[in-house]
């Protein structure tokens, strides 16, 4: 993932989260994330992006509400937890089966997010955690390339 601040690399857990990782891979293949802004930054907690409304001028009031138009069911594995910074997971509404395109990267261990119903972890940052920590609200995702998956 190339951002305004630099490159972030992460591994995707295609074996333990095939639906969620597959959804992310599909969206990347469509260049869905190119030009999308990080619309939520909570220091010490998460950065969040993936809302297509962030590409549309005048739609600031909708930031955080958009998606790809396709929801996926909540997919959890006991092996995949929010136990370290750099956890990559899908954001969703109160409906556990409402994940679509928005994702977040944790800035610290956030194990409370594993409490039922929880959130679908599908990856982990392997390089560029310094970039993750430098992201601010409004920083842009320039492109996302899938080169390999675990």
Q: Model-found features: residue ranges?
A:
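Cyclophilin-like peptidyl-prolyl cis-trans isomerases
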Residues: 1-150
């Amino acid at each position: 993932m190339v951002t305004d601040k630099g490159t972030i690399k992460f591994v995707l857990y295609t074996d333990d989260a095939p639906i969620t990782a597959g959804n992310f891979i599909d969206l990347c293949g469509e260049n869905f994330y190119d030009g999308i802004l990080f619309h939520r930054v909570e220091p010490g907690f998460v950065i969040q992006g993936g809302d297509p409304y962030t590409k549309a001028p005048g739609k600031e009031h909708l930031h955080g509400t958009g998606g790809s138009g396709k929801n996926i069911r909540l997919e959890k594995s006991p092996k995949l937890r929010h136990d370290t910074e750099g956890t990559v997971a899908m954001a969703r509404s109160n409906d556990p089966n409402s994940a679509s395109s928005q994702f977040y990267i944790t800035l610290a261990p956030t194990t409370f997010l594993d409490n039922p119903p929880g959130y679908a972890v599908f990856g982990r940052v392997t390089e560029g955690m310094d970039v993750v920590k430098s992201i601010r609200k409004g920083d842009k995702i320039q492109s996302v390339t899938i080169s390999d998956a675990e």
